[in-house]
From Swiss-Prot:
Residues 453-614 are annotated as: Pectinesterase inhibitor 26 C. Pathway: Glycan metabolism; pectin degradation; 2-dehydro-3-deoxy-D-gluconate from pectin: step 1/5. One of its GO terms (molecular function) is enzyme inhibitor activity. The lineage of its organism: Eukaryota, Viridiplantae, Streptophyta, Embryophyta, Tracheophyta. This is Putative pectinesterase/pectinesterase inhibitor 26.
Amino acid sequence: MDTVKSINKGYGKVDETQDLALKRKTRKRLYQIGISVAVLVAIIISSTVTIAIHSRKGNSPHPTPSSVPELTPAASLKTVCSVTNYPVSCFSSISKLPLSNTTDPEVIFRLSLQVVIDELNSIVELPKKLAEETDDEGLKSALSVCEHLLDLAIDRVNETVSAMEVVDGKKILNAATIDDLLTWLSAAVTYHGTCLDALDEISHTNSAIPLKLKSGMVNSTEFTSNSLAIVAKILSTISDFGIPIHGRRLLNSSPHATPISVPKLTPAASLRNVCSVTRYPASCVSSISKLPSSNTTDPEALFRLSLQVVINELNSIAGLPKKLAEETDDERLKSSLSVCGDVFNDAIDIVNDTISTMEEVGDGKKILKSSTIDEIQTWLSAAVTDHDTCLDALDELSQNKTEYANSPISLKLKSAMVNSRKFTSNSLAIIAKFPIHERHGVQSPRLRKSPHPTPSSVLRTVCNVTNYPASCISSISKLPLSKTTTDPKVLFRLSLQVTFDELNSIVGLPKKLAEETNDEGLKSALSVCADVFDLAVDSVNDTISSLDEVISGGKKNLNSSTIGDLITWLSSAVTDIGTCGDTLDEDNYNSPIPQKLKSAMVNSTEFTSNSLAIVAQVLKKPSKSRIPVQGRRLLNSNSFPNWVRPGVRRLLQAKNLTPHVTVAADGSGDVRTVNEAVWRVPKKGKTMFVIYVKAGTYVENVLMKKDKWNVFIYGDGRDKTIISGSTNMVDGVRTFNTSTFATEGKGFMMKDMGIINTAGPEKHQAVAFRSDSDRSVYYRCSFDGYQDTLYTHSNRQYYRNCDVTGTVDFIFGAGTVVFQGCSIRPRQPLPNQFNTITAEGTQEANQNTGISIHQCTISPNGNVTATTYLGRPWKLFSKTVIMQSVIGSFVNPAGWIAWNSTYDPPPRTIFYREYKNSGPGSDLSKRVKWAGYKPISSDDEAARFTVKYFLRGDDNWIPKAVMGMPPL
């Protein structure tokens, strides 16, 4: 029997290459999301910051001798470098430059950028050279990734240099540009890390080449990190030096500012000057110089010519994907080529839109309007992204199957795309960096911040917080209202419309595809996809309805309670879509159908993620305090969530109830089976429908569908009223559908019931209970099985005084879940297996999901000799907290284990915490040393994961009057 590490859980746990791809993609966005939020906050509070800065200027326009430390240049450099992770390399690299004889922190920062640029330029060709030394195609592919990423890193650092404003020939930082600099340098740091990730993927090779490149990258990694650290601390550093930001005159700070003199240049020199701001200056000069009208010194005319170059090149390759598709019968490759054809056409439309926005003037020439610069940058950025999307589609094939890595068709298309991507990048760099407005006496918008944000700039800022900004911008911008609004709430509503429309367009696809196959396993997987798409549509629809109530009511802001709901429902939709992909990955089907469905899901996946990011990062207001002061009281509280209304709470506590339906196997009730009772439940009921199930064992599989709302089912005791099933993965049923009992409708409650899956450990995945019910409660129930016993799939769930038994990942899912006063009991698994209690499945940083185990007991169910862990991270943002619980000695001292030892330790994006646990297994001295694991340090921090806080995810929802329950 395989060890637990090799058991297929599906659900994102099978394909290691996909897992690595997800990690690379997510890491690439982590800094951008965080910094984009900072940009939004800066927009909101910009007026306050401006007042504060100028007040400081008014109070002290020039630093007094007493306010400026008497530092030598060396001491100044040492002070600035002290904020970095690599102060020694920071000091030694900058001190070698001639201009380092300065005490000005801003000049030191500029010198640090020069160090980075020089170092990156010295290694940018290294991956290509090293690739010539090997025949290992996997290694060549990794080196190609590094070459591309180092290219991008140079772009980002160049943008950082260009963004620093010009004053009397000098460059100077201001507060408004610092967020941009942080974003670009963060991206450059990420690109280094992604290159290293790519090299680590091919660690099986015996070649010394990866080590050569890693060694070659040490300096650039450190220098880029140094620049990022310096700019992140620049304001406080300048303050420490006693230099007011506006003490030195900035552009437009004085009506007497000396204009920058622009030397008269020849056409050739002008072209070189314009192209110098691009990443590919040689291709920029050579391509534009071939055009007849390139004999000009006008930067704006040269920009127009760069666009013409892009259009010509794109038109020359637009039909190539279709032609290449005729040369292959491989459906997956055809699908990727279709993606490339679509994005090429989109890029052509974008560049044509760019040209169209240039205003006609009297002599037939075109001139850029400053008001359109933001739009042009957005469009050209999207055109660059279109190229990358094609490359991603081709690279995804090679990640899954090595035969695609050197496919002649893929290589043909990649080679043909080289120029169009370079030319598009050149046009973007020119409009973003070169002051092309000075000829017309119009100040460059790069140097002038409009006090009134435009619809396009707000859309771009909002979309920058998402994982897929290009698809966010392109999808929302197609809606008419996006052209006129600067309200983030309205843009969020438009994003929901985009998501809803896209989900509706694919919701029937699994059923259609099922008609194209006779493979019963694949049909079963497609059936799961149909079900979860349905659930996702409902979740998005709930989100829209709730938001529309706020908008129609004329409220300007969403309250924290509503935002908590919206994040929960969209988190659920993200999970639902991911579950379809996971289910398709549970088996290796000899069919193009899974890839067809995955390709069709791309937009819905991205759009749902975008909507979640917007509400979580833009609309959710930061808390005024870390946590209400009553942190300790919350930890000691054993009350139910506040959405368990007093009347419902009385139902849970009552001893004598009058049910709507009574189930009795002996015929003494209204019906004999639980399913018969479920059929009697009204659809979308507003009041609680009560089902009583008398003592007995009911062998049946029960599904409480999504339209069965507010159902309360109770029995005579967890050991007396039992629902039993044996559906399992080995017998051909997908994990999602193996549950003995599943509930999807909101407001579900269960009391004094036992749910069992008797399939046994040999049958692997065999779920006893699955919950997708939002605001559901389980009181004095038991869930008994082996692998995957309790599937807390999605939405808010509360388990109180319940028993859960199992072996492998026996509490798993991506709901927002609290276990309180429960008995969690691992049992003996198969030989060579180990136990893992939890496998939490949060996919994205913005999901408010996770598992909190509070005031529980973790003890063995019988004689357990197998190694037992508290859990392992299933997904990239896995979140699990165990606090104030009793942990038995049978738990391994390490506490936690990585999903696959190949990736040990897990990424720092996971969130694993413990707090004030007791028992022999609670000793933290030998716990894992992961970046994503650490003990909680205070009651206030721990209170975030209590019932009152975690199940709503916001500081402000805790009621004044706590609803008490009997002591645990």
